[in-house]
UniProtKB/Swiss-Prot annotation:
It comes from Arabidopsis thaliana. It comes from the Eukaryota. Might be related to the phospholipid scramblase and tubby-like superfamily of membrane tethered transcription factors. This is Protein LURP-one-related 13. Belongs to the LOR family. The lineage of its organism: Eukaryota, Viridiplantae, Streptophyta, Embryophyta, Tracheophyta.
């Protein structure tokens, strides 16, 4: 499979918000539930509500304002997660699910809001290995890479390509890890 130049231009609409799109590549580190930039500044944190079922996670900014809510569909055999803008469970942005129940390599599909009734072809694909905790995120079923993640020393390192919504990518990374590990990063 051909690798894409990470400095190449991507023309992608912001999925979570335009404030999360940068014209240059962005490296983030993820340790536990905290996401930091290359200078060590906290960018995001993922919170798990204390009460209720533990099938929900909330991505918050450094001021604790909710950016997206990730909610696992409990009755799904494909580890389906639905993602909503902010804390409003009426404003669904996208759905993430395992492509099949039995896999040697993990393949997860992402369906944007407009594509959720058919789910015939995904809008994004995440491919990775369970044991290595590494993955690559592609546009649809193509070879166009928009982000790559690998495991560093006790943390994950993510490279998000230019013009890609990094809140969207961080959300996908957490869901991918939850699907793989069952516990989070």
């Amino acid at each position: 499979m051909a690798k894409q130049d990470p400095t190449s231009s991507n023309t992608m609409l912001p999925l979570v918000g335009s404030e999360f799109v940068r014209p240059q590549p962005l490296d983030l580190t993820i340790t536990g539930d905290t996401v930091k930039d290359a200078t060590g500044n906290k960018v995001f944190k993922v919170k798990t509500p204390l009460f209720g079922l533990h099938n929900k996670r909330i991505l918050v900014d450094p001021n604790d304002s909710p950016i997206v809510t990730m909610k696992m569909k409990v009755t799904s055999k494909h580890d389906r997660w639905q993602v909503y803008r902010g804390s409003d469970l009426d404003d669904k942005i996208f759905t993430v699910k395992r492509s099949s129940t039995v896999q040697l390599k993990t393949r997860v599909e992402v369906f944007l809001k407009h594509n959720q009734t058919r789910e015939s072809s995904c809008d994004f694909t995440i491919k990775g290995r369970f044991m290595k905790r590494a993955c690559t995120i592609y546009v649809a079923d193509s070879t166009k890479i928009i982000a790559q993640v690998y495991e560093g020393h006790e943390r994950l390192v993510a490279t998000i390509y230019p013009n890609v919504d990094y809140a969207f990518i961080v959300t996908l990374i957490f869901i991918f890890d939850l699907i793989n590990m069952g516990t989070g990063i």
